[in-house]
Structure formats: structure tokens, C-alpha cells
């Protein structure tokens, strides 16, 4: 990986390309981020930078977090994320990373926390088929069906059942960067991005591009 940045999902809209086609895009307010820590192969065994994003008050942070920022000599921030990079020679503690590190036409991987939908049935959670509505099926029609009554007489782990749906970390790969607005710290990517409006997302160059 060569670059990364922390951002906030603003929502979706649409823009028109040069041929007049409608392109659905997600707007992300990316950065500016501050380098809170730099890791090197010599000292840490791998090369990485730790980015900090969005100003925070001291009362909202732990003593360990406050001490970490004070040691680096940077302002207090809410969010921290480490990005492993091939080369960290261009970064030092206190360096600022902005959205113009990316460019239109590139492909990126974006990680976020999906919307939490609470306790959900197996039909909606796993897209299973409903049971037949007639001919002896009842009184329920939205259950997953038989799970092994006699043999093996138990339910295997990871069986698709009802439970918590959403609120999990998901990465969407190979999203196309349509536009960059360096003045407003905006990046527009084609397609949807996991999470609700205002959710924190991590943008990095694509590993499969």
C-alpha cells in the first residue's frame, strides 16, 4: 500500500460524465489528517504511519491517548488509524495528509462500519427462501427450516440463523475515484460505501487494482 486517509461519509449524489451519463457517487470528506506516529522497519519490524483525524476535547480522551498525542506534539484528535505503507520516508510526526494524495481515475478500497439493523430474522439477514405458504406448512413461514433433527442432533457453528444484522466492518474494493476537490477536502467515488451518513471510513489505494 502506498497511501491512505481517514474520512467521513457525507452521503450519495449523482454527477454527469463527459458523455452525459449519470454516475452515482458517494461523497467523502477525507482529511486533513495528521501523522501521530511513524513506524519503521528498523524499530518496529514494518513500515507504517498512524493518522489522526477530527479535533477532540481532552475530557473525551483517555490519559493514554492524551499522552500519545502530547508525545507526538500534535493536537488532540478523535480517530486514530494505522496504515502500512511501502515507504514512509516522506512522513514525520506532525505531517499533514490531505485528499490531494489521491487523484481522479484511481481505484481505492474503502472500509467502514455498516448500518446496524438490530435483531433480524434469517430471511432478511441471509436472504433465505421462505417456506411454502400452503400444503401443510405452518404455523410459521419465515424460519430457516430443518437443521438436522436426528443426526447430527446438534447445530453446527456458523449456521445461518436469526441474530444481529449489520454493525460490522466491511471493505468495498476497487471503487473508482471520479473527482477530487482539494479545497473542500472532498473525494467522490463511484458507487456505494458502507455505513451511515457521518460514519468514519478509511480510504486506501486498491490492493487488487
Task: Please provide the spans of the model-predicted regions.
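Extended basic (Lys/Arg/His-rich) segments that typically form rRNA-contacting surfaces
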Residues: 1-209
Amino acid at each position: 500500500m502506498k497511501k491512505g486517509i481517514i474520512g467521513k461519509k457525507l452521503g450519495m449524489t449523482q454527477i454527469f460524465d463527459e458523455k452525459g451519463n449519470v454516475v452515482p457517487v458517494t461523497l467523502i470528506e477525507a482529511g486533513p489528517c495528521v501523522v501521530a506516529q511513524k513506524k519503521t522497519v528498523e524499530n518496529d519490524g514494518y513500515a507504517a504511519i498512524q493518522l489522526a483525524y477530527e479535533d477532540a476535547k481532552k475530557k473525551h480522551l483517555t490519559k493514554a491517548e492524551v499522552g500519545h498525542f502530547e508525545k507526538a506534539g500534535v493536537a488532540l484528535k478523535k480517530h486514530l488509524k494505522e496504515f502500512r505503507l511501502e515507504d514512509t520516508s516522506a512522513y514525520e510526526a506532525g505531517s499533514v495528509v490531505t485528499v490531494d494524495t489521491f487523484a481522479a481515475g484511481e481505484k481505492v478500497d474503502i472500509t467502514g462500519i455498516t448500518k446496524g439493523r438490530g435483531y433480524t430474522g434469517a430471511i432478511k439477514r441471509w436472504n433465505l427462501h421462505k417456506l411454502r405458504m400452503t400444503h401443510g406448512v405452518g404455523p410459521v413461514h419465515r424460519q430457516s427450516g430443518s437443521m438436522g433433527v436426528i443426526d447430527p442432533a446438534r447445530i453446527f457453528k456458523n449456521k445461518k440463523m436469526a441474530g444481529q444484522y449489520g454493525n460490522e466492518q466491511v471493505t468495498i474494493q476497487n471503487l473508482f475515484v471520479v473527482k477530487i476537490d482539494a479545497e473542500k477536502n472532498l473525494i467522490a467515488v463511484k458507487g456505494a460505501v458502507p455505513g451511515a451518513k457521518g460514519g468514519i471510513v478509511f480510504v486506501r489505494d486498491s490492493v487488487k487494482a
